[in-house]
Amino acid sequence: VEAKEAYHFEIVSKGFQHQYWQAVLKGAQEEAERLGVTMNFVGPNSESDIADQVQMLNSAINAKPAAIGLAALSTDACNDALQQAKDAGIPIVGFDSGVPGAPEGSVVANAATDNYAAGELAAEKTYEVLKDRIAAAEGSVRIGVMGQDATSESIINRGLGFIDKIAELAEADGYTVTVEGNDKYVQDSKVEPTDDAKVILDVAVPSQVTAELSATDCQTLLNKDDTICIYGSNQHSGEAMVTGNENLQKLGSGEDQVLGVTFDSGTVIKEAVKNGTLYGAVTQAPVAMGAAVIDLLTMAAN
């Protein structure tokens, strides 16, 4: 990719609160420098601040850049602004999360993990380890699913990919499965609810995206007698699992411990995998994603 002009891009991310976003920023900065383009990379203080992100997107449109990058916190909240950008002739490139239902033609490309498939991958690796424990359990077993929200495409699909694949694998082994907890995940999963399930998928979503609330969700799941595993669908949830476990010390891969699996990396998660607190994590390529955003913005501007 080569830039035909010294373009300026506006990029609206989900924030800077995780090392993941710092890595995306690094990739974008390096590629912008290589191509001779400039960018303004912004994001809200918290991934709960949807209204702030919409305001940032409106400001980005008013700056009249060659193109805009957007990692949408909500699949619905940005639609009016996306229509405005389209009317102004400013192409939008999605990253990290897509914007399903965006006004037609407003989002020209998307740089993201296949989040549903990534959730399925986490489930496949997890089920391999849990299979014997499910078979040996006399009663029901509970698998916790921690999602930081029920609004962004990436978080929802990583959760649903995990839920649907665990259910598929468990049902293939002859078990009944149900999903309980957060309504969005219960309704959107492929699992038919049943009262007498062998495998319970229990979805916890905090009222706001804070480390404290998610750590409390983790502790609630760890304190349920039938919990055998917890899955966190991003860096926020994975780190909250580590924090929530500090006083309880229930996570691990021993027979009487709760298996912890998560998403993304970062110092805390890598250390937790290394010391055995977490069994493993599915990681993305955030630096490459940042570079890909700049490439796609440049191609759109060209």
Positions of PLM-derived features:
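A residue-level marker of the well-folded mature domains of exported/periplasmic proteins
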Residues: 1-302
